[in-house]
């Protein structure tokens, strides 16, 4: 690769990353507005009071509460721990965790933008299958003693929370200005939780789309880019390599979607892409946090459950879609690359939802000053993973700025 060619590819990679983000911006905003409103008006305390210990109803409630929660993996992990410690059953708690990272509204919008309706259906139907397979595996393995030991560990380490927490009526809250100010605070907290993952994910996706040759994907994912329907062993290999690839990206589900679109554009099977998307809970930061909460034995048990469930789900979804003739065919080009910055529906949707963000910013910071406590999230010293992500995001911004300069002067 000569020097001139590198600078051309560099600028192309950066423009691709920015094009990815521009294409997805309205979907991010819409998803986080809906998610923030639901989280404010349906509180964690209400979830704790409603979810039971076990049974179909409790699993269904855990799934529903996950669906209406934040898509941030780290927030979902903390909420799952809290629900489990408060008495929610192990399976309903894991159902909440899986739903909050695979069934949330905003994720569906982003998948629709980058991958199309088949993957949206695959995400939601597959997400439900993922929970069912997880439930079956737990019932088969019956880790009763381990669950009892872990719950005791949590209660001994953190103590019991107050049981008499007052749960506000959402019907009254939704009619108040203060309620919508809380929505605005939650909206910007959502962005604060995911900005690093999104920045890194979109930057890496643009770089991979331009710099990594198609032959690499064909080597990594057996049968990719060859057309037709690969054999079962190739599909199985794709569903195993998908989580491995996600493990090394170690970014959240929202940041992984543009990378999934790159895999799809390079001919990776439907099963492989679905497995990659479902793998945000089998990455190292999540394993480490689970170990911190529950101990390494439970962390590896959860890892094993999720890996087995997502491989089974991806295979079932692939052959189910194939049976009904619904398997999508890759065009060889990511949908987000086709027209990056045209004056089209994406442009007007972005303008409209940026205006919504402006209104939320006014609600958050306009008018009278409020106590700072509402915006604080997480608190304390940042973890090593958070610091690594922060500096990787800064490097990403430097990379993007350099590419824009290269695009202007080339």
Residue ranges, per PLM feature:
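Short, strongly hydrophobic alpha-helical membrane anchors
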Residues: 1-17, 410
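Hydrophobic core segments of alpha-helical transmembrane domains in multi-pass membrane transport
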Residues: 32-37, 128-139, 201-209, 242-246, ...
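Juxtamembrane and boundary regions of transmembrane helices in multi-pass small-molecule transporters
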Residues: 53, 58, 120-165, 289-373
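Membrane-interfacial, low-structure loops and terminal tails that flank and connect transmembrane helices
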Residues: 157-184, 369-385
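Transmembrane helical segments that form the transport core of multi-pass membrane transport proteins
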Residues: 42, 48, 184-265, 270, ...
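Membrane-interfacial helix-loop connectors
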Residues: 67-125, 213-306
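Alpha-helical transmembrane segments in multi-pass membrane proteins
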Residues: 23, 27, 31, 35, ...
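Alpha-helical membrane-protein architecture signal
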Residues: 7-10, 14, 57, 61, ...
